[in-house]
Amino acid sequence: MSIKSDRWIKRMAEQHAMIAPFEPGQIKHDAAGQRIVSFGTSSYGYDVRCSREFKIFTNINSTIVDPKRFDPGSFVDVESDVCIIPPNSFALARTVEYFRIPRDTLVVCLGKSTYARCGIIVNVTPLEPEWEGHVTLEFSNTTPLPARIYANEGVAQMLFFQSDEVCETSYKDRGGKYQGQTGVTLPRT
């Protein structure tokens, strides 16, 4: 299993719609020329953006977080260019990009150093072979202060690993519960 280069990522995005919308280079400035957190193709990965759709965790109901019986009322829905995550809390978002993962490929997501150095951690489980959809992103604010996330700017990097053999059973074959997700998706069992 080897990590894939920018050439492979570009080819798969352009010929097989693996990433849409797709940016073949690194974007570091907005339309007004202001610096932003970069996104787009890097040497051995793809830096994704989060959309303007956020779900900010709150404990107004004083409930217990239970992945089998998750209370959607534990989140406040926000649509904005900026998301303020409360201290020691988290927020969910989704990528701008829609992914279609090839059957012989596994994708691992890592945070961007710009956010990590501010105490903001990104958590995403691997994108499995033949999974497709918008990626639900989880941002943890590990600081005792509110933290800011910017929509339509880079938030995480996807690394693509291609196996030397095609898997016997893909995520699609298993009927994975998050297949084809298009919005911020809460836990399912």
From Swiss-Prot:
Pathway(s) the chain acts in: Pyrimidine metabolism; dUMP biosynthesis; dUMP from dCTP (dUTP route): step 1/2
Disulphide-bridged cysteine pairs: none
Protein name, per record: dCTP deaminase
GO molecular function terms attached to this record: dCTP deaminase activity; nucleotide binding
Recorded superkingdom: Bacteria
Keywords of the record: Hydrolase, Nucleotide metabolism, Nucleotide-binding
Catalytic reaction equation(s): dCTP + H2O + H(+) = dUTP + NH4(+)
Active site: E138 (proton donor/acceptor)
Lineage: Bacteria, Pseudomonadati, Pseudomonadota, Gammaproteobacteria, Lysobacterales
Record-linked InterPro entries: dCTP_deaminase (IPR011962), dUTPase-like_sf (IPR036157), dUTPase_trimeric (IPR033704)
Enzyme nomenclature, EC number: 3.5.4.13
Organism: Xanthomonas oryzae pv. oryzae (strain KACC10331 / KXO85)
Any GO BP: dUTP biosynthetic process
